[in-house]
Regions:
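A generic structural signal for well-ordered alpha-helical segments
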Residues: 31, 73, 108-109, 178
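Amphipathic alpha-helical segments that form well-ordered structural scaffolds
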Residues: 67-71, 104, 153
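Helix C-cap/helix->beta junction micro-motif
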Residues: 34, 76, 110-112, 181
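N-terminal helical cap/lid subdomain that shapes the substrate entry/recognition surface
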Residues: 2-99
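Short, conserved clusters of charged catalytic residues that mark active-site
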Residues: 99-100, 149
Length: 226
């Protein structure tokens, strides 16, 4: 795969934002109060299940996360703390951006049209775009399980054929790209054990799997020199 052959990158939200870290930092203190505390994997599964249950009952990401906190507390048989639920609801808009993301998207924007693929529910897109140094050429916010029409509309609006876009997904279980496997895709594994830019995949033109966006930007530089 030659990443220089594409006109656009379809970046899923979790390639830019450490969503799982934000979720766990907000819910671990609650889980610790339970007689049967959940581990991180169980907390993330509970978050995803409750998000689906509440998605059509609330009108804003802040309200969704506040109610999600209260609902999880009830499931754990804990009296939900109002202030804590409000804090969790507000914190969702400030989940940490990966350290490499701002610089990487700034570099990649010089060579690609950038398309943001948002999760289906519970995300404040404006809070992310305000914290990045570049504007996205298009934003796809899936409204249901089949978000192909929204993607097709976004690509048409920026005059990029579907074959000209390279999807870039995270390793999260509910990454939006996981439901579309009918064309080549890049995966960011975010392997913190290896330094950025030194993984073999950054230097291997036959694969598209990187440890970070910085890794991918470095691979692009190598491809230009090849």
């Amino acid at each position: 795969m030659k990443i220089t052959h594409y006109q656009a990158l379809g970046l899923s939200y979790a390639t830019l934002v450490d969503r799982e870290r934000g979720i766990l930092e907000g819910l671990r203190p609650l889980a610790a109060q339970s007689a049967q505390p959940l581990d991180d994997r169980q907390l993330l599964a509970a978050y995803r299940n409750l998000t689906l249950q509440l998605a059509h009952q609330v009108n804003s990401p802040t309200a969704l996360h506040g109610q999600l906190y209260q609902r999880l507390a009830q499931q754990l048989r804990i009296v939900p703390d109002w202030d804590a639920s409000v804090a969790f609801g507000s914190a969702a808009a400030q989940w940490p951006i990966y350290e490499d993301a701002p610089g990487a998207v700034q570099y990649l924007s010089k060579f690609y049209r950038l398309i943001l693929i948002a999760p289906r529910h519970g995300i404040d897109i404006e809070s992310l775009t305000r914290r990045l140094p570049v504007a996205f050429d298009a934003i796809v916010e899936p409204a249901d399980d089949d978000w192909r029409p929204a993607l097709a509309h976004a690509l048409q609006a920026i005059d990029v054929p579907r074959i000209g876009m390279l999807p870039v997904r995270s390793s999260e279980a509910d990454d939006p790209w996981n439901s579309l496997v009918d064309f080549p895709i890049c995966t960011l594994q975010r392997e913190q054990a290896q330094p950025w830019n030194l993984t073999q995949s950054a230097l291997d033109a036959k694969r598209c799997e990187y440890a970070s966006l910085a890794d991918m930007a470095h691979a692009h530089q190598w491809a230009l020199r090849a």
